[in-house]
Amino acid sequence: MKFIIKLFPEIMIKSDSVRKRFIKILTSNIRNVLLRETEQVAVVRNWDFIEVRAKVAEEIPLILDLLKRTPGIHHILEVQEMPFTSLHDIFEHTFAKYQNQLVDKTFCVRVRRKGKHEFSSLDVEKYVGGGLNQRIESARVKLTKPDVTVRIDINGDKMLLVEARHEGLGGYPIGTQEDVLSLISGGFDSGVSSYMFIRRGSRVHYCFFNLGGASHEIGVKQMAYHIWSRYSTSHKVRFVAINFESVVGEILEKVDNGQMGVVLKRMMVRAASQIAERFAIQAIVTGEALGQVSSQTLTNLRLIDKAADSLVLRPLITHDKEKIIALAKQIGTDDIAKSMPEFCGVISKNPTVKAIESKIVEEEGHFDFDVLEKAVQNATYLDIREIALQTEKDVVAVEATSALTEKDIILDIRSPEEMDEKPLVLAQAQVIELPFYKLSTQFAHLDQSKNYLLYCERGVMSKLQALYLKEKGYQNVKVFNLPK
């Protein structure tokens, strides 16, 4: 099977040199993504499209799923390639493929052609369309809005019959734009804003300000890992965690109640600017939307930006909450966000919506900035690919096993798409399907007299979720490894 990758239209209108660079980067990204999962694939770059050849038929659904989640791809054509010798040969190949699909249907033929031939694209459309109309009695030609569009691509002495068209993610390939640092809290907004910059071609690193202990950090790591694993595995990214509990304590003790929200955000962008400068990252990304909460008025946002040494970007600035939640649902972060508490909103009871700069500066004069510097100096840096290993060191260890007892139930915590693609079937073992993002709300409703062995394909999410449940006080959880 062969896939033809069509590029995001904005790439095609670039100058020749820029377009060539973008296509080269996208080809490299596709290789990186696919080769993490299978070696039975070939990727070939062309002038205005990319070919992907699947060598093993069983891996076609996996390859297609990965391509649909790769930024820079407008759409994917699933095609069958075959040689031809004449115009009639093209018709015969097309008839063999479509004779059953066109019964009692309206259809039209659309042809794209490259190379030197004795016929034009219109000649092929007329010949093949007329032949199909004659051979299939119940079929009828309809040039506008037909039931079936027969698509044929001709290149030299080969023809491609398009079996299916799949929409891609769009956007620019990761690496065509400069890196950004996303301030991720685990809520709806920060996850969506991170995704939007990934789709726009930036490599997104993550900076997390821990206000709620180990369980809060585990939850945010789950979201960051989920976004990375679905949309940006072509690139290595960093996860930076800064313990901000001491900073919050200093603010609570020394800053006027009404100014706390703005001061906290200013401390965050100060710290993030230092991290960004260290790694030559050009901008900070936040999930703020205009007027959504008290600190997100134009006056307050301007004062927050004044504390930053880096450019602050807000892709959601005009988005409604309803639209943000819909996007979170689309990318699979909504259920994680639902279980995440909003710590920033609880430190100020009467927040100002129109902070005065002189007042903010005065309040920050009471703040001991050594506390902030110490928090930044003690930040932890993690390659997101090693997130499970680092978590094991930081939090209570979780037992992993492949042996089962009568009290053991396996919890398949993969996403519904992964479950459908590779169902987990084990002889003499009860398997319950419960996606990882529902564990925080539904685990308590399970029979707690049983032991639950959490399973995911790579073991990353199962370890994180087991650690999260241990933090919540559940001792009847382990990680399940498939027997070899």
UniProtKB/Swiss-Prot annotation:
Residues annotated as domain Rhodanese: 404-483
Disulfide bonds, paired cysteine numbers: 344-456
Catalytic residues of the enzyme: 456 (cysteine persulfide intermediate)
A single GO cellular-component term on record: cytosol
Family: Belongs to the ThiI family.
Pathway the protein acts in: Cofactor biosynthesis; thiamine diphosphate biosynthesis
Domain THUMP as annotated: residue spans: 61-165
Gene symbol of the encoding locus: thiI
GO molecular function: ATP binding; CCA tRNA nucleotidyltransferase activity; tRNA binding; tRNA-uracil-4 sulfurtransferase activity
Protein name stated in the entry: tRNA sulfurtransferase
Keywords of this entry: ATP-binding, Cytoplasm, Disulfide bond, Nucleotide-binding, Redox-active center, RNA-binding, Thiamine biosynthesis, Transferase, tRNA-binding
Residues at which ATP binds: 183-184, 265, 287, 296
Purpose of the protein: Catalyzes the ATP-dependent transfer of a sulfur to tRNA to produce 4-thiouridine in position 8 of tRNAs, which functions as a near-UV photosensor. Also catalyzes the transfer of sulfur to the sulfur carrier protein ThiS, forming ThiS-thiocarboxylate. This is a step in the synthesis of thiazole, in the thiamine biosynthesis pathway. The sulfur is donated as persulfide by IscS.
Enzyme class: transferase
Record keyword Glycosyltransferase present: no
E.C. code: 2.8.1.4
GO biological process: thiamine biosynthetic process; thiamine diphosphate biosynthetic process; thiazole biosynthetic process; tRNA 4-thiouridine biosynthesis
Cell location: Cytoplasm
Catalytic activity reported: [ThiI sulfur-carrier protein]-S-sulfanyl-L-cysteine + a uridine in tRNA + 2 reduced [2Fe-2S]-[ferredoxin] + ATP + H(+) = [ThiI sulfur-carrier protein]-L-cysteine + a 4-thiouridine in tRNA + 2 oxidized [2Fe-2S]-[ferredoxin] + AMP + diphosphate; [ThiS sulfur-carrier protein]-C-terminal Gly-Gly-AMP + S-sulfanyl-L-cysteinyl-[cysteine desulfurase] + AH2 = [ThiS sulfur-carrier protein]-C-terminal-Gly-aminoethanethioate + L-cysteinyl-[cysteine desulfurase] + A + AMP + 2 H(+)
The keyword Mitochondrion appears for this protein: no
